[in-house]
Amino acid sequence: MRKHLIITLILLLATAYITVVYFKNLNPPGSNTSRVMHEIPGNASVIFEFNNDSSFYDIFKGNPLFAAVTGRQILGQLDTLRQQLLQNKLLSKYFSGQNVFISVHPTQTKNIALLVTLPASADFDPAIFDQLAKQPGNGILVTPLQAGAKHGCTLYINALKKRFYLVKNEFNIYSGSFSKDLVNEVALIKKTDSAPSFALLSEQQNANSLASIYVNYSELDPLFDCIFRNKNTDIFKSFRLLSGHSALSLNYKTDALMFNGETTVQVNETISYLNLFANQQPVNNQLKDIFPSTTAYSTSLAVSNQVSFSKSLSDWYTKAGYKKEEGQLFNKIQAETGTDLKKRFYALLGNEFAIITTRYFEKLAIISLKDGSKMNTLLMNVSKMTDENSGQLSYDKLPFFY
């Protein structure tokens, strides 16, 4: 009996030891996005996450979509990093299968810098980077780098004629960029127990997703200042005013980059127009079927509860200081035409509307209606008609308050 007890205890201890060693050597960031996010500076507006696996690269090989978004030069630089570092025979086994995070940051000089953050396996030794320079014909020069309290290296990549700065963080997580200033920001990150400034996908969603994108809308404004000459950024204008976070999964499609997921809106911040849709439920979009063939880009919006949306819109006008002007306009229309336009108009509205810009820079608005004939009769009272089906509104700001 004692012999069996001793054997059982030995087996239990061996099992416990193997379990501890196993989980110690598991790479935590691969299944813990939050830990990696803590190593990314808070001024990141967008983070793109994907798995460093050959299948991901095979799917998008030769596809022009990413180049259309990032530009061929930037995509070419990232691809060179992949080939010369992640797929290098000295490094590949330590980074294969790990999730790569590419974050977008504005710089002091009104430029955009990318930060690449990814974990290495627990058995990776940073000294292996020094061996890269000894590989014949790889065109990489390695020199030590000290960024704050963090150690790393500078990789001069001959194929790009550029330096790539790399530092080691906790838990064998590495951060690298062509911008030395951005790497220095990484070195200054203070560790806290607070959550990263991004909404995250669940572990299951993250594991099943081909790629993910995380958006911090509060940081889009400084990013757009680097991209656009003015703040009237058309379809992006509402996003500049939105306070919230999105965690989205990539849906594979050969001719489009499509993401779906959830957005968390910060209710105590400044309310933008998009906040009005926070309590609406998804509905089928049908207006897209009648978009003109010359459409360059569009914004489609829909509501599931028109009564609730109308109330939210009215409250938004009040907070924005437009309520008085709205009341004066509709009172004027009532006095001049005898038409209670607001009440009758809302009763005829459908639940979809869209704004379209064509490749000729024409702007069109499309609104779904419950009864087009009745709406046409109603609008005749407040318009200068050119024929029975078209005309110009007699009150300039009327579309704004619709």
Say what each PLM segment does:
Residues 2-7, 11-156, 198-243, 260-360:
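Structural boundary/hinge residues at secondary-structure and domain interfaces
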Residues 48, 154-192, 402:
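A short, solvent-exposed beta-edge/loop patch
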Residues 119-124, 178-183, 369-373:
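Helix N-cap motif at beta-to-alpha junctions
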Residues 132-142, 193-194, 383-392:
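A common structural junction motif
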Residues 144-149, 166-170, 254, 357-358, ...:
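Generic beta-strand structural signal
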Residues 164-185, 254-266, 270-276, 289:
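Charged, amphipathic alpha-helical scaffolding segments
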Residues 360-367, 373-376, 382:
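Ordered core of a single globular domain
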Residues 389-402:
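C-terminal soluble interaction/assembly domains
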